Amino acid sequence: YIVEDDFDCEFRMVGKPIPSVQSMDRNHRVIYINTFSKTMVPSLRIGYMVLPEKLMERYISTMNFYSCTVSGFEQYAMAAFLEQGYFERHIRRLINDYRGQRERICRMFRKSPLSRISQIYQDDAGTHFLLHVRTDLSDVEIKWAARQRGILVNCLSEYCFADTQKYRGILVIHYSDMEDEVLQKVIGALEEIFL
């Protein structure tokens, strides 16, 4: 079986959502899991799992003892929120908010001296975008230099299985709810590293 964690799938800013692997699974070999912690509030702690029919009986017989830690009230409230269409409207509002944040942050990067040696890729991003910096530094050196300045940086090569050199110098910038003050610190640290 394949376990598909479709975390953050709701926040695609451009075009239709990318279909889940589970939605294309003709052999019923994908277990689909997701959570409402990013779309609602982390303290809600409600997740869900879609099992292939073949696994349902086995799941029920082995997990029957499990006592759910989420209150029934929260579960019923979430179910009503979904059934009455409020969740979809909530997601649309979040997407508009995140789109505004992304545009503001990209504007700040474009006004920075860093823009002379970098390019932003944001077409299909959710709550992140890619910043490709033309540099001779390795991704390990970039991460180390950023950490020395109190910044945690993810590089695209960390998410790749092979040919990581092809993705050298591409930073994954996560931006949800990032204050301007924090962003200025991040941009300043990146300018120190690359300029």
Please report, for each region that a protein language model flagged, where it lies by residue:
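Catalytic PLP-binding core of fold-type I/II PLP enzymes
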Residues: 1-15
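Structural signature of PLP-dependent enzymes
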Residues: 60-63, 84-106
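PLP-dependent enzyme catalytic core of the Aspartate aminotransferase-like
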Residues: 148, 164-195
